[in-house]
């Protein structure tokens, strides 16, 4: 199913726009928390702990949110999380301005993470139910395209707000905008407005779901390793400002990859697609160890982004097959696995960089991708042919 047909489904264009607005804090919140907490406490370590608390909260919250969505529907979960998320961030800003204790900022950051609204999860559920199986590749690609755009635009808008105001005011404004977008998005839902009649199943009835989570964890490791490797490389080259351009290369590649991947039908089995995409990702990232010129580095990262988002899309397609009776919770576990993998990847990349130099994190990223490909290939032995 081409994108033109998906855009013709009533409500989808509005949901995509509102979903974009609602996800502005996805990337902004951790950065904003660091800036606000560091200014209040004077310690980067304490600010980092607050940001880590946000990430931990987000990882803990996703499966719970998904289970509630399976049982109660999307709207009440979105409304509740929007209020919790915005209230916690505004309380954090106020507490920091008042010079409150740092541990309370960490607690508020954790609460903000727990309440991070499950927008992309809701979009997958909504569009998956309203669009036939033949259109799921395009629908899930559009989900990641919208998310990637929000992750690209959000920090830029945040930076502009900081330039004209302050980090505290900027974080508060972005939080309010995201909260309003979430509430508007929840009202725009149609199929996801009520709980699915199937939504009381068990996530891990099919044990292949556990294998898929392990694959996605390794894919998250790729992302985490790159998050450490890119600023380290730019700093080592004496051009720390180039970090933004390198991150943008990966994001732009992800946008282009999601758009291209969803624009056509694929004849390969879904399991084979996932293994193949991760293999290509690993082979693309491995040469970064040898690349010297930053422009060439940018081009290789763009190529990596071209397959990164399609790999995430393909993992979502397998959720349709492995956990059809508890999709929202399963998607929540996918998000948690990506976050856990990101933490592991960041840690591994940091150790590799200290031991072997600033290029080593990219070898770690490639190793995560190749390991994910090998593990995904085991799904071929028991998997059924894909139908999307």
Per-segment meaning from a language model:
Residues 33, 117-131, 230, 310-323:
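Intracellular juxtamembrane helix-capping segments at the cytosolic ends
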Residues 271-313:
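C-terminal transmembrane helical hairpin of 12-TM major facilitator-type secondary transporters
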């Amino acid at each position: 199913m081409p994108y033109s047909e998906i855009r013709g489904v009533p409500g989808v264009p509005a949901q995509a726009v509102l979903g974009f607005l609602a996800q502005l804090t996805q990337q902004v919140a951790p950065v904003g928390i660091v800036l606000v907490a560091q200014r209040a406490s004077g310690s980067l370590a304490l600010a980092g702990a607050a940001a880590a608390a946000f990430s931990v909260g987000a990882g803990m919250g996703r499966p719970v949110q998904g289970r509630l969505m399976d049982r109660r529907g999307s709207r009440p979960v979105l409304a509740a999380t929007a209020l919790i998320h915005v209230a916690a961030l505004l309380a954090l800003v106020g507490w920091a301005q008042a010079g409150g204790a740092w541990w309370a900022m960490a607690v508020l950051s954790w609460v903000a993470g727990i309440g991070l609204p499950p927008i992309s999860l809701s979009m997958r559920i909504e569009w998956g139910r309203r669009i036939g199986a033949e259109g799921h590749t395009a629908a899930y690609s559009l989900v990641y395209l919208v998310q990637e755009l929000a992750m690209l635009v959000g920090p830029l808008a945040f930076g502009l707000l900081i330039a004209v105001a302050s980090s505290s005011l900027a974080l508060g404004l972005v939080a309010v905008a995201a909260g309003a977008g979430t509430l508007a998005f929840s009202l725009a839902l149609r199929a996801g407005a009520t709980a699915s009649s199937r939504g009381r199943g068990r996530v891990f009835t099919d044990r292949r779901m556990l294998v898929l989570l392990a694959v996605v964890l390794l894919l998250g490791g790729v992302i985490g390793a790159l998050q450490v490797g890119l600023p380290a490389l730019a700093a080592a080259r004496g051009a720390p400002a180039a970090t933004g351009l390198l991150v943008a290369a990966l994001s732009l590649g992800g946008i282009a990859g999601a758009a291209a991947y969803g624009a056509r039908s694929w004849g390969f089995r879904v399991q084979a697609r996932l293994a193949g995409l991760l293999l290509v990702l690993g082979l693309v990232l491995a040469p970064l160890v040898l690349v010297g010129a930053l422009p060439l580095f940018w081009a290789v990262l763009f190529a990596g982004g071209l397959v990164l988002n399609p790999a995430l899309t393909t993992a979502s397609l397998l959720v349709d097959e492995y956990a059809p009776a508890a999709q929202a919770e399963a998607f929540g576990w996918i998000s948690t696995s990506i976050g856990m993998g990101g933490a592991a990847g960041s840690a591994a990349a940091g150790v590799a960089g200290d031991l072997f130099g600033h290029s080593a994190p990219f070898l770690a990223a490639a190793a995560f991708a190749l390991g994910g490909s090998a593990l995904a290939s085991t799904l071929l032995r028991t998997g059924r042919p894909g139908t999307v």
